[in-house]
């Protein structure tokens, strides 16, 4: 499979299908035992669901690994987009859960901050593994909508178990037992009686039952 520049991809599958393993292969954290991965990108960044919080300021956290000299205005703009406006006045406040002087944020707020760091990244390829796991469905939809605008010229791979969140992606990759079994846009995959359609219908039925 080839990732094309400027396209947005979704990677889905049940738990244990191999999504996170594939992510770590793409980031060169694992080495393939068979086959090859050809990497033509100069800069990559990733946001995993188990992101870390470090004893640094909000500004330092947002610009971690970012060599560009971003203005406070740009940082504030992204924080506004992700409903983190309350942090704009405290960019130099220590961000940590380990000290009394730190800024105490909820898990959802911390996840928004981690997403903001990805939004500010200058990388060519951005991988996001369950980036909205701590957000409600409405907030999740908004994050994916914003990502289409912010990542216009970048290649992105969103890994999620919530299929509704990736229905607007350019292409969706479906893993099953460690194998890429289907790929295509949402409409194409729904026309097939395959893994994706069954997963999507199951999730839709579960959502209706909860309502």
Per-region residue spans from a language model:
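Conserved catalytic loops of ABC-family nucleotide-binding domains
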Residues: 149-158, 166
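C-terminal portion of ABC ATPase nucleotide-binding domains
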Residues: 145, 167-211
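Conserved "ABC signature" C-loop
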Residues: 51-99, 122, 195
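Helix-to-loop junction immediately C-terminal to a conserved catalytic motif
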Residues: 27
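The feature captures the beta-strand-to-loop junction immediately N-terminal to the Walker
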Residues: 12-14
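ABC-fold ATPase nucleotide-binding domain signature/coupling loops
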Residues: 54, 84-113, 131, 206-211
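A short, proline-enriched helix->beta-strand linker immediately N-terminal to the Walker B motif
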Residues: 102, 120-124, 153
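Catalytic Walker B motif of ABC-type/P-loop ATPase nucleotide-binding domains
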Residues: 126-130
């Amino acid at each position: 499979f080839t990732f094309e520049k400027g396209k947005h991809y979704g990677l889905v599958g049940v738990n244990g299908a191999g999504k996170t393993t594939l992510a770590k292969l793409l980031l060169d954290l694992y080495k393939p035992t068979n086959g090859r991965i050809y990497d033509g990108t100069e800069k990559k960044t990733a946001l995993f669901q188990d992101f870390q919080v470090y004893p640094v300021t909000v500004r330092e956290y947002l610009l971690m690994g970012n060599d560009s000299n971003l203005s406070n205005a740009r940082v504030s703009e992204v924080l506004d987009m992700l409903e983190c406006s309350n942090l704009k006045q405290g960019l130099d406040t220590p961000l940590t859960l380990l000290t009394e002087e730190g800024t105490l944020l909820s898990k959802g707020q911390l996840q928004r901050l981690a997403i903001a760091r990805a939004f500010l990244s200058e990388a060519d390829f951005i991988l996001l593994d369950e980036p909205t796991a701590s957000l409600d469905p409405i907030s999740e939809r908004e994050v994916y909508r914003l990502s289409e605008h912010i990542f216009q010229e970048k290649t992105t791979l969103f890994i999620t178990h919530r299929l509704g969140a990736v229905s607007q992606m350019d292409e969706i990759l479906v893993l099953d037992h460690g194998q890429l079994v289907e790929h295509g846009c949402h409409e194409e995959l729904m026309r097939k009686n395959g893994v994706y359609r069954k997963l999507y219908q199951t999730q839709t039925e579960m959502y209706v039952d909860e309502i």
